[in-house]
């Protein structure tokens, strides 16, 4: 067969690594083995006390001694609250559920606010199900469907059984399978040379990939080549599946319909978002508790992160008080950039961070401090490296001063426009003049407010 390979055009800036988000540079909390934060580490600069406090929280979550508690990240805008929450998730790893949302997301026309919050609570609680299954695993050496006369008569024939030969590192086996499994084999598009495994109880067939013995073949379709399975063909295999409690709620709230036309048409229509009843959740919790007692499953409390918590109203705060006391609850991380302000849904209740006093009493509060000019300079320098931009020293000093006087976000947002201005002028390095030109083109919040105040009839 003729080898055909596709050569993609290399367009500068088009690679996946070139796409940068606001917190691309955050890699973790930047703590040493003793839990002490370094001044510059993991994408963070400064915020030593806040990072060390978050490190203690991560240790408590890993030890499963933190569920049902809440943390508040309190500080001004551009002090790294969202970055801290993101770093907590990266320290916990991908197996721990993390559910981020903003306070305004809880308001819906179809579903009441407390129901939406409860859904997100359940999304942040994981269940790791361990199951030992008997499987046949190996490379397919033979695949022969055997036919028989149709018992109903006529000229057609039916498949009576399927002969499948499997080979592993320690031997071979020939299996005689039920004809219903042949449909699964066809669905998975299994052919001789593929590595598959068949569950002996359910008869489920899974194609793992193509055997690496066929790696020298060339095909138009890209194949995933896998090594020959070790051990015997027939073996016991531990299968671990990670689901959330919300997945179990939805699976039981929306059972699959029948195969008739009316059921199929009902599934095609856009389903209206419905509430999951408390009774159903209670039944799911009982089944989960039974699995945990049997040692089949393990509960993994995750993290629910609510940003702009001051946007919640008094009803949600009241519900949150009760939800934190549930037997199965995640770690709740709240973030607020407000000081003394009125609690939403009330007329005269003024409280710190826009949160009622009774809920504040339950919170562990982590404070984030404003960055100094030297810290802002280091942040801008690191961010410019992430965006592949070169800054001269004078331009870096001006951006650091602007970040201190105006805001860190504004200084960081000027990096890309200044880079484009420098590239237009035929330079790879951003000069002081590029920053000044970008500053003239794009206003910051303070200058925009001054213009509006001096021209009161403008709008």
Curated annotation (Swiss-Prot):
<dbReference type="GO" id="GO:0097255">
    <property type="term" value="C:R2TP complex"/>
</dbReference>
<keyword id="KW-0347">Helicase</keyword>
<keyword id="KW-0010">Activator</keyword>
<comment type="subunit">
    <text>May form heterododecamers with RVB2. Component of the SWR1 chromatin remodeling complex, the INO80 chromatin remodeling complex, and of the R2TP complex.</text>
</comment>
<dbReference type="GO" id="GO:0006338">
    <property type="term" value="P:chromatin remodeling"/>
</dbReference>
<dbReference type="GO" id="GO:0031011">
    <property type="term" value="C:Ino80 complex"/>
</dbReference>
<keyword id="KW-0805">Transcription regulation</keyword>
<keyword id="KW-0234">DNA repair</keyword>
<dbReference type="InterPro" id="IPR027238">
    <property type="entry name" value="RuvB-like"/>
</dbReference>
<keyword id="KW-0156">Chromatin regulator</keyword>
<dbReference type="InterPro" id="IPR042487">
    <property type="entry name" value="RuvBL1/2_DNA/RNA_bd_dom"/>
</dbReference>
<dbReference type="InterPro" id="IPR027417">
    <property type="entry name" value="P-loop_NTPase"/>
</dbReference>
<dbReference type="GO" id="GO:0000812">
    <property type="term" value="C:Swr1 complex"/>
</dbReference>
<keyword id="KW-0539">Nucleus</keyword>
<dbReference type="Pfam" id="PF17856">
    <property type="entry name" value="TIP49_C"/>
</dbReference>
<comment type="function">
    <text>DNA helicase which participates in several chromatin remodeling complexes, including the SWR1 and the INO80 complexes. The SWR1 complex mediates the ATP-dependent exchange of histone H2A for the H2A variant HZT1 leading to transcriptional regulation of selected genes by chromatin remodeling. The INO80 complex remodels chromatin by shifting nucleosomes and is involved in DNA repair. Also involved in pre-rRNA processing.</text>
</comment>
<dbReference type="GO" id="GO:0006357">
    <property type="term" value="P:regulation of transcription by RNA polymerase II"/>
</dbReference>
<keyword id="KW-0547">Nucleotide-binding</keyword>
<dbReference type="GO" id="GO:0006281">
    <property type="term" value="P:DNA repair"/>
</dbReference>
<keyword id="KW-0227">DNA damage</keyword>
<keyword id="KW-0378">Hydrolase</keyword>
<dbReference type="InterPro" id="IPR010339">
    <property type="entry name" value="TIP49_P-loop"/>
</dbReference>
<dbReference type="InterPro" id="IPR003593">
    <property type="entry name" value="AAA+_ATPase"/>
</dbReference>
<dbReference type="GO" id="GO:0005524">
    <property type="term" value="F:ATP binding"/>
</dbReference>
<dbReference type="GO" id="GO:0043138">
    <property type="term" value="F:3'-5' DNA helicase activity"/>
</dbReference>
<keyword id="KW-0067">ATP-binding</keyword>
<keyword id="KW-0804">Transcription</keyword>
<dbReference type="Pfam" id="PF06068">
    <property type="entry name" value="TIP49"/>
</dbReference>
<dbReference type="GO" id="GO:0043139">
    <property type="term" value="F:5'-3' DNA helicase activity"/>
</dbReference>
<comment type="similarity">
    <text>Belongs to the RuvB family.</text>
</comment>
<dbReference type="GO" id="GO:0035267">
    <property type="term" value="C:NuA4 histone acetyltransferase complex"/>
</dbReference>
<dbReference type="GO" id="GO:0000492">
    <property type="term" value="P:box C/D snoRNP assembly"/>
</dbReference>
<dbReference type="GO" id="GO:0003678">
    <property type="term" value="F:DNA helicase activity"/>
</dbReference>
<feature type="binding site">
    <location>
        <begin position="75"/>
        <end position="82"/>
    </location>
    <ligand>
        <name>ATP</name>
    </ligand>
</feature>
<dbReference type="GO" id="GO:0016887">
    <property type="term" value="F:ATP hydrolysis activity"/>
</dbReference>
<dbReference type="InterPro" id="IPR041048">
    <property type="entry name" value="RuvB-like_C"/>
</dbReference>
<protein>
    <recommendedName>
        <fullName>RuvB-like helicase 1</fullName>
        <ecNumber>3.6.4.12</ecNumber>
    </recommendedName>
</protein>
């Amino acid at each position: 067969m003729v080898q055909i390979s596709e050569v993609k055009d290399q367009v500068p800036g088009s690679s996946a690594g070139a796409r940068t988000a606001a917190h691309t540079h955050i890699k973790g909390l930047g703590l040493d083995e003793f839990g002490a934060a370094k001044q510059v580490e993991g994408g963070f600069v400064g915020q030593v006390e806040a990072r060390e406090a978050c490190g203690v929280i991560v240790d408590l979550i890993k030890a499963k001694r933190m569920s049902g508690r809440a943390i508040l990240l309190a500080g001004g805008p551009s002090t790294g609250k969202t970055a801290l929450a993101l770093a907590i998730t990266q320290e916990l790893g991908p197996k721990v559920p993390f559910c981020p949302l903003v306070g305004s997301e809880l308001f819906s026309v179809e579903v009441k606010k407390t129901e939406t919050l409860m859904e997100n609570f359940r999304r942040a609680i994981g269940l790791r199900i361990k199951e030992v299954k008997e499987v046949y695993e190996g490379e397919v050496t033979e695949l022969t469907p055997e036919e028989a006369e149709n018992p109903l008569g006529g000229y057609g024939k039916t498949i009576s059984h399927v002969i499948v030969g499997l080979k592993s590192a320690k031997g071979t086996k020939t299996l005689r399978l039920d004809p219903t499994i042949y449909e699964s084999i066809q669905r998975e598009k299994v052919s001789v040379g593929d590595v598959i495994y068949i569950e002996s109880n359910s008869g489920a067939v899974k194609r793992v990939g193509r055997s690496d013995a066929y790696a020298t073949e060339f095909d138009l379709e890209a194949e995933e080549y896998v090594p020959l399975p070790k051990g015997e063909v027939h073996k016991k295999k531990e299968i671990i599946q990670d689901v959330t409690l919300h997945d179990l709620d939805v699976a039981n709230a929306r059972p699959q319909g029948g195969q008739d036309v009316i059921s199929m048409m009902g599934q095609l229509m856009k389903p209206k978002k419905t509430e999951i009843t408390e009774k159903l959740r209670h039944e799911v919790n009982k089944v989960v508790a039974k699995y945990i007692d049997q040692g089949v499953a393990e509960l993994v409390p995750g993290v629910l992160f609510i940003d702009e918590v001051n946007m919640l109203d008094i009803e949600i705060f009241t519900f949150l008080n009760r939800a934190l006391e549930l037997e199965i609850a995640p770690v709740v991380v709240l973030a607020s950039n407000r000081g003394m302000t009125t609690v939403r849904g009330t007329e005269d209740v003024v409280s710190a961070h826009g949160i009622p006093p009774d809920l504040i009493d339950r919170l562990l509060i982590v404070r984030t401090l404003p960055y100094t000019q030297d810290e802002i300079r280091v942040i801008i320098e690191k961010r410019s490296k992430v965006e592949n931009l070169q800054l001269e020293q004078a331009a870096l000093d001006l951006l650091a001063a602007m970040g201190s006087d105006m805001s860190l976000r504004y200084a960081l947002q000027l990096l890309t426009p200044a880079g484009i201005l420098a590239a237009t002028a035929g330079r790879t390095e951003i000069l002081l003049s590029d920053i000044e030109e970008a500053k003239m083109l794009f206003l910051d919040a303070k200058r925009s407010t001054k213009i509006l105040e001096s021209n009161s009839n403008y709008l």
